[in-house]
Amino acid sequence: VQYAQTVDKDDPVISCPFAYNRIFFGAPGTGKSYLLEEQRKKYFASPERYERVTFHPDYSYANFVGTYKPVPLKNEAGESIITYAYVPGPFMRIYVEALKHPDKIYLLALEEINRANVAAVFGDVFQLLDRDDDGNSMYPIHASEDMKCYIAKELGEEPNKISSIRIPANMYIWATMNSADQGVFPMDTAFKRRWEFEYIGINTSEQQMSHYNVQFGQG
């Protein structure tokens, strides 16, 4: 969050020795999700410090970031009523947690990222993927009124103190991607350049699984 008055950029944050925006890619079955999960358990072990979501063709910006939705409630008389509220998606939930706890690192894990139209899913959040040397978003985006109210409520601030948002340096986004599969969406160059790609091949997968012993039945 960028406040309308001042922003303290000197708050120290801890980190892990990997890229902030990272995609594990390779053929299906090569262990991409396994490797991501092993590193997740090492650096983001607490359940409240990560969220995992699987992309699919119908996944949208509203699912990923958040949107205004009807929410059922009970009034004082105990009657069911429908009201509307901003319902955050996994991106916004992890983003807010990272802002609340700048001394901890948080992970958003995106499985099968290219099974959705990433340009549509990320929307204006796409601009936040450019990070500076400290890991913060280089360029802020304008926060909608609904988003401002939600963030302000979570942080105990006034909405008018929030003018824009940036991804903080303690928030990591890692993803898996099938490079040879049907039913996937292409990624444009502008999107790709904002990520560090790590190829997971057959040999890499074999090395990851080398410490397991597999016993076959007799007879």
What are these regions (language model features)?
Residues 1-219:
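C-terminal regulatory/interaction module of P-loop NTP-utilizing enzymes
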